[in-house]
Amino acid sequence: MLRKRQVHLDFHTSEYVPVGDNFSKEQFQACLKAGHVDSVTVFSKCHHGWSYHPTKVNEIHPQLKFDLLGAQLEACKEIGVKAPVYISAGYDEKEYLKRPEWRWCFSPDKKAMEEYEKEVHFHTLCFNTGYLDFLCAQIEEVMVKYNPCGIFLDIIAPRVCYCEKCVSDMKALGLDIENEADRESFGQMVFNKYLEATNNAVRKHSDTATIFHNSGHIPKGDYRYIDANTHLELESLPTGGWGYDHFPLSAAYVRTIKDAEFLGMTGKFHHSWGEFGGYKHPNALIYETALSIANGAGCSIGDQMHPLSDLNKATYNLIGKAYSLVEEKEPWLFGAVNVADIAVLSAESTTGDRSVKADVGANRMLLENHMLYNFVDENADFSQYKLLVLPDVSAYSTEAINKIKEYAENGGKIIATGDALINEGKFFIDFGAEYKGKNEFEPTYFKPCFETVNGNTEYVMRCSFNKFEATEGEIFATEQNPYFNRTLEHFCSHMHAPNNPQEEFQGAVINGNIAYIGWDIFTAYATHGHLCFKELFTYAVKKLLGNEQTVIAEMPDRGVVTYTRQQKENRNILHLLFAHTTVRGTNTEVIEDTVPLYNVKCSVRCDKRPSKITLVPENTSLEFEFVDDRAEFIVPKVDIHRMVEIAYEN
């Protein structure tokens, strides 16, 4: 079982600075204790290419005079802290400079490669060269010498490469280097070879060591990669470019994978990795770790040890402020499974394209609406969910289309948007509507047939629209076109032409258990964020789910609501989170002051009357009413994170 309070201790250290001079086992242990840390990832080899222990395979850091890795492992063992070992896989700057034939060549353009080689950063090596054997030898050396509890391999991904070896091997296989599909296929073959070789290097010496290959993102639907790991670590530093909504999206997918244990990896830095002297406010770290545990994950906090190798006391006092709270909450975390009403069939998993924005927009709408949801791929059992969302894109396999049809035929509720229900030029589910093709106008306008914040007027929709004609059901939105598309020949004002009110078409329909929205609202929401996109989706959800929604909590849009089940303890845990973020500097979203919420009204659908409802870990009872299969209660205060236990008699 993964531990919940981990630190990822980066140690990428130049050969031009002293290393290890200040290391003290006692100081190292004292800081880990102050941080309430129960697992720390320590370094065998860094991105610079140096080892931090005696080695016959690689080269020890030229300024290191003792076995630093061995000393760290011993220190951790004495205090019961686990210590997986880190080995940089994709980067090895020392070998990149020494071995040109091992270099990853991202382009056949020699000038582009020369410019890349001069850039001041780490450079990538190719796994289709002798470097892979070199890497595996390093892994085996660590396994034999230290028998660690786990191996963490970093900077890995399928890559197209134009190095001499890759070009030669592609030709030998009859693949065309000029063909993009062939290049990507060969890149995946090389990546698969890397996964197999490195895993074998671990498994030759241990059946129990954990293995994780880090690429900074968990690719949805890619089981060749997912299954190569014993667990998953979701690298997601909100201030490091990932943002505060990346982790909930990634977690909502990963927690659906059978038997998958996972961590949410944030950092103590103000910005991101490698920032010596950068600290976020304790409230930010408290929120980020609470977000991890509320989404079913353990926690991992990134730090970077000073080259002199003494841990920074301020850092571990900061970490301790967050992890002391996580430690108190652990009895309500182990074995907890997230409950979800809604499944989103991930656009990334369907298309294989990480850059599609539909998942991002859907995640934001669901998060802001405080709905219980998961992201799933085509392998999921849709029948577990009350509502299936099909966002914007249509690239489903025949098997997936049949599963969606079966789900609908059995009464499953569906909301589909944009192209999601279209296959071979028509809707693949009969919901009383006929597909009429892609609208030639963009943007278009949406006019609601229901109450909205700004009333019954025309709202611009900066996205594509599919025309359709429904003969059954409730039309809950209509569509209007602009007078014309903006071109050099004709344009109007600064942005786009106004709506033409003389013509109005069907825009969204609900018929029975199926809702269809003609616009790509999720992609548009991720890009533009118009409130009307969310209002359109929210109306459809509430119309279809009604009183079946498991949790309703009156929270601001930045609030987060999750709900978990501990079967063994016969209880559910309601997680309520709220933090106010603000932008500091250039696009750095930070959390500083807490803004408590008071008297938060909650309504939870229950199979039977709870025996008690309690604030935990404080063990403060809450009064509640049980009406129409719903427990109604008020949470007096939410200050960053609040957990509510809903318990039942056995």
Residue ranges: model-predicted function:
Residues 85-146, 179-184, 195-197:
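Active-site-adjacent "subsite" loops/lids of carbohydrate-active enzymes
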Residues 2-3, 31, 39, 66, ...:
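Carbohydrate-binding surfaces of carbohydrate-active enzymes
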Residues 1-49, 79-81:
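N-terminal structural segment of carbohydrate-active enzymes
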Residues 11-23, 121-134, 274-282:
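Active-site mouth loops of central-metabolism enzymes
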Residues 10-12, 41-48, 87-94, 152-162, ...:
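Short, solvent-exposed turn/loop segments enriched in Gly/Ser/Thr/Pro and often Arg
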Residues 1-15, 110-122, 257-273:
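N-terminal small/glycine-rich loop or linker at the start of catalytic domains
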Residues 28, 33-68, 91-118, 146, ...:
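Aromatic-lined carbohydrate-binding/catalytic grooves of carbohydrate-active enzymes
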Residues 18-20, 52, 88, 94-98, ...:
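Short, solvent-exposed loop/turn and secondary-structure capping segments
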